[in-house]
Amino acid sequence: MTDTVEDVELPYDDSASQQDKLEALEEQLSTLEEENEEMRDRLLDANAENNKYQQKLERLSHENKKLKQSPLFIATVQELTDEGAVIKQHGNNQEALTEVTDELRATLEPGSRVAVNNSLSVVRQLDDEADVRARVMEVDDSPDVGYEDIGGLDDQLREVRETVELPMKDPGLFETVGINPPSGVLLHGPPGTGKTLMAKAVASQTDASFIKMAGSELVHKFIGEGAKLVRDLFQVARDHEPAVVFIDEIDAIASKRTDSKTSGDAEVQRTMMQLLSEMDGFDERGDIRIIAATNRFDMLDRAILRPGRFDRLIEVPHPNVGGREKIFRIHTRAMNVADSVDFGELAADTGDLSGADVKAICTEAGMFAIRDDRTEVRMQDFQSAREKLDQDSEPAAATDVSRTFA
Amino acid sequence: MQGQNQQQAYDRGITIFSPDGRLYQVEYAREAVKRGTASIGVRTPEGVVLVVDKQTRSPLLEGSSVEKLHKIDDHVGAASAGHVADARQLVDFARQQSQVERVRYDEPIGVRTLTKSVTDHIQQYTQVGGARPFGVALLIAGVEGGEPRLFETDPSGTSNEWKAVAIGSNRGDIQEFLEDEYDAGLSVDDGIDLALRALNEGREDALSGDGVGVGIVDADTGTYRELAADESQSYIDDIEDAADDSDDDDDEE
């Protein structure tokens, strides 16, 4: 470096000796060298920092670009050939022959789910998961219902437990006797008699995975979707053996097959057929128990009622007097009830009412007490509630119709 | 609901068969019959008994104006179930036919002949457009050549002869009861007793003399007559006494 600095402040007095001047200069040189070193270090640091930020910038702008890009399509690999992979897009079902990188190719197999971009080349492989809708049906939090919350249905409950619990608790018993445990129960009966309640109790009391769904959830807009959901549902169940599948309001999909030409009906029927074959078809069902509930037993297709699918058809009737009394006690457990309330009398007084009606009476009775500014529910409240409900449910007078007939 | 769509197209016209050979309007007319209260006929060697349920909806209604039993001719009576006004039309037709027979041949009409002409009339309303079938069934009871006869007509125009039969609401249970209890050698009193017990079957409230109508065609005299309310009541009392007695027997055992 030939830079010359004019007017440098010298670290010595002009009057000092040569020796002193030299020492001072040397001292200055070493300080400057140290400083230089330090500055170089800082430069390096700054450079590194710069690099880091540069990279971050690059990454962010890349990400930004990616976000602006159009999303990937989902497709299923149909076949792997020498020329590439045949994929079928979900939704529109278009098939295409496309390129696959060797790296991806090693992991792909027919049936894998993949993501493809706009030009239909395979970008990455996706988890081969069952339909999300099927997965969310698994019940993780057990409902807060126990067997003791069910009033009156002792025989029915016993049959359900025999079917669902016993094979899990004591599978050896069935082996010894030499029979296959019953695999499915169908609960049928009028509305409000506790069919779903029983299923809830089973869900909370067994250790098995419990998968619930409503029949109507299986009805879909596009052909084949309902059937796919049924398939996925049973796949989820098989993955979580032992499992209990509960289908509420099964009449939504399992009604009698007719020659109806409406395509909607036909699709619902196809969904049912998938259900039939999953329940007792060619493939082994595994350790899966099925509980279904309906209040339109007469509407169900005969094929679904045959043994092997639903081995037990359990009628859940309106409760009898004893059952109603029990239900009254269950629903008033948390209520502040006066000692004078006679549940036996109430039960005898409420013929033909369902469990849900009894519950409604209890709630109504509580409302009467509140209206009266009391915290204690008395017999009178229950009677008023019953009368109120009677009025609500009384059918419209049929006298005008009967006038025509004799 | 499934199944109804396809049906709907075929129940619009009375003259149109469904692909499986049914006439839906006629089947609906049978439902009208079920809306009527029960009528029961029992044939015995001594005569034919008709018992009808004419329970009134209001205590202010005159029981005698409830038309369930009809006199067709001296020797023929009928009980109806279903659409009252339709029944009146058929009864008028039957009365007219029996009078025509008397004028034309100077003899009382045969019960079978009368039934056939009534059912022929009913049948026309299942085959002609622009009309509806009769929403009523009749039990036609009479004496023909000293022999008691009991016929039933149906909204389709079919007629059947019966030993004992029920029409109207709760028909199935009553018919079952009759099938279990009927005996070919019954007297007229036994016949009334049987029919009343059958009517009592599956009823919630008790029978009363005002609430039932009893018509008898006697084979000996060859005449039709209706019992008064107090006569019916005495039969009902007999049944109740018998029931009480058997209850007492049960208690003693």
Swiss-Prot record, chain A:
Residues engaged in binding ATP: G192, T193, G194, K195, T196, L197, H331
Localization terms from the record: Cytoplasm
Example of a GO cellular component annotation carried by this entry: cytoplasm
Residue numbers spanned by region Disordered: 1-20, 385-406
Coiled-coil portions: 12-70
UniProt-recorded Gene Ontology molecular function terms: ATP binding; ATP hydrolysis activity; proteasome-activating activity
Database matches in Pfam families: AAA, AAA_lid_3, Prot_ATP_ID_OB_C
SMART domains named among the record's database cross-references: AAA (SM00382)
Signal peptide segment: none
Biased composition (Acidic residues): 1-12
Cited HAMAP family: PAN
Family of this protein: Belongs to the AAA ATPase family.
Quaternary structure note: Homohexamer. The hexameric complex has a two-ring architecture resembling a top hat that caps the 20S proteasome core at one or both ends. Upon ATP-binding, the C-terminus of PAN interacts with the alpha-rings of the proteasome core by binding to the intersubunit pockets.
Protein's job: ATPase which is responsible for recognizing, binding, unfolding and translocation of substrate proteins into the archaeal 20S proteasome core particle. Is essential for opening the gate of the 20S proteasome via an interaction with its C-terminus, thereby allowing substrate entry and access to the site of proteolysis. Thus, the C-termini of the proteasomal ATPase function like a 'key in a lock' to induce gate opening and therefore regulate proteolysis.
This protein's name: Proteasome-activating nucleotidase 1
Gene name tied to this protein: pan1
Swiss-Prot record, chain B:
Record SMART domains: Proteasome_A_N
Lineage summary: Archaea, Methanobacteriati, Methanobacteriota, Stenosarchaea group, Halobacteria
GO molecular function, one term: threonine-type endopeptidase activity
Keywords associated with the record: Cytoplasm, Proteasome
Stated family: Belongs to the peptidase T1A family.
Control of this protein's activity: The formation of the proteasomal ATPase PAN-20S proteasome complex, via the docking of the C-termini of PAN into the intersubunit pockets in the alpha-rings, triggers opening of the gate for substrate entry. Interconversion between the open-gate and close-gate conformations leads to a dynamic regulation of the 20S proteasome proteolysis activity.
Places the protein is found: Cytoplasm
Biased composition (Acidic residues): 237-253
Gene Ontology CC entries for this record: cytoplasm; proteasome core complex, alpha-subunit complex
Start and end residues of each stretch annotated as Disordered: 229-253
Gene name of this polypeptide: psmA
Protein name: Proteasome subunit alpha
Aminoacyl-tRNA synthetase listed as a keyword: no
CDD domains attached to this UniProt entry: proteasome_alpha_archeal
InterPro entries in UniProt: Ntn_hydrolases_N (IPR029055), Proteasome_alpha (IPR050115), Proteasome_alpha-type (IPR023332), Proteasome_asu_arc (IPR019982), Proteasome_asu_N (IPR000426), Proteasome_sua/b (IPR001353)
Function of the protein: Component of the proteasome core, a large protease complex with broad specificity involved in protein degradation.
Subunit structure: The 20S proteasome core is composed of 14 alpha and 14 beta subunits that assemble into four stacked heptameric rings, resulting in a barrel-shaped structure. The two inner rings, each composed of seven catalytic beta subunits, are sandwiched by two outer rings, each composed of seven alpha subunits. The catalytic chamber with the active sites is on the inside of the barrel. Has a gated structure, the ends of the cylinder being occluded by the N-termini of the alpha-subunits. Is capped at one or both ends by the proteasome regulatory ATPase, PAN.
Biological process according to GO: proteasomal protein catabolic process; ubiquitin-dependent protein catabolic process
Pfam family, one: Proteasome_A_N
